Structure formats: C-alpha cells, structure tokens
Amino acid sequence: MQTFITNTKKWIIGFLLIFIFSFATCKYGFKDTSPIPIDVKTFRVNYLENKASYVNPQLSPQLTEKLKQKIINTTRLRQNNNDDAHYDVSGYVSQYQLSTTGISGTNATQSRLSVGFHLIFKNTLDDKKNIETDVVYNLDFDANKTLPEIESSQGPVIVSNLVDAIFNKIFSNW
C-alpha cells in the first residue's frame, strides 16, 4: 500500500509539473528594426548617386534598388515616389578606394576595397529624427586579384553590406 501511495504521489506531482510548465512560456524575438511610429506610412528612396573619384557604373542603380527592396520586405512602409513621403532617403557613394593592407617583403599580399556612402535621411513628420551620416564597407581580398574580378565576384556582397548598414542607420536604435 505504501508503494502505491508513493507512486501515485510521483504521478500527481509529475502531472502537475507538466501541466504548470505547459502554460508557462517564454518568447524571445529579434527584429532588425525599432518600432516605426504608426503615423509613418510611406518612404521614398531617391537615386543614390556615385560621386566617388572612381565610378563603378553598376553600384548606384543596384544600391538604390536593393535598398528599396529591403525597406519594402522588412517594414510595413509603402513606397511613394512623391515629395510627400514620410521617410525620404537620399545620399551618394562618397568613396570607392583601393588600398594595400598586407605586405610580404616587397610584394602586396592583401588589398582592401573601401566603399563609403553618405546618407541623408529626412523624417518629414519629425525633424529631430533626421540623420546625415557616413557608412563605410571594407572588403579585404588577395592582392593577386584585379579590381574588375573583385567587382564581378563580390559586387553583390558589397551592395548587400552597404544596404544593411544604411538600413540599420535609418531603422535601428542600437
């Protein structure tokens, strides 16, 4: 009889623990954006020009389109190409520079492509939220590769990283 009572207590305690923990939940989430005010509904991305001393002709159109797509796909904002957009994004490629970062003896072993972007963000509903800042993406690569090879193979990576950096400057409060 004693064994029966002990086993019954174990079953009841086990059932109660399962029952209690089934209602206890913990939710953790990570979003790339801070909350966008409810009155902000539209955005406009102006053509992002290339004003660097060296112009990669593919960079500006790709940067412009990828930034638009990132905002459309990750926020609730609608694109508006008029002057009355709530968020107005503009800017230009300010730097496109190749440098040597690694040397062995008298030979370069590693090079760096630095791509800088000057961001101008206007919040037409709250001037205090306007931003004017610079972002830079550095890509290190083997010095035996040429710039056209790197632009061809790493162009999407460069654009993606710049878009992420621009997006985070606008939408994240980190």
Which role fits each region the language model picked out?
Residues 54-65, 108, 112, 149-161:
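Soluble non-cytosolic domains of exported or imported proteins
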Residues 2-13:
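Bacterial N-terminal signal peptides that target proteins for export
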Residues 43, 89, 133:
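A broad, low-specificity signal marking well-ordered, structured residues that form hydrophobic/aromatic
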Residues 23-68, 72-78, 125, 168-174:
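A structural "domain/chain start" motif
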Residues 14-23:
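Bacterial N-terminal signal peptides
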Residues 73-130, 138-149:
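Surface-exposed short loop/turn segments
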Residues 27, 123-131, 138-174:
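C-terminal/domain-edge helix-coil "capping" segments
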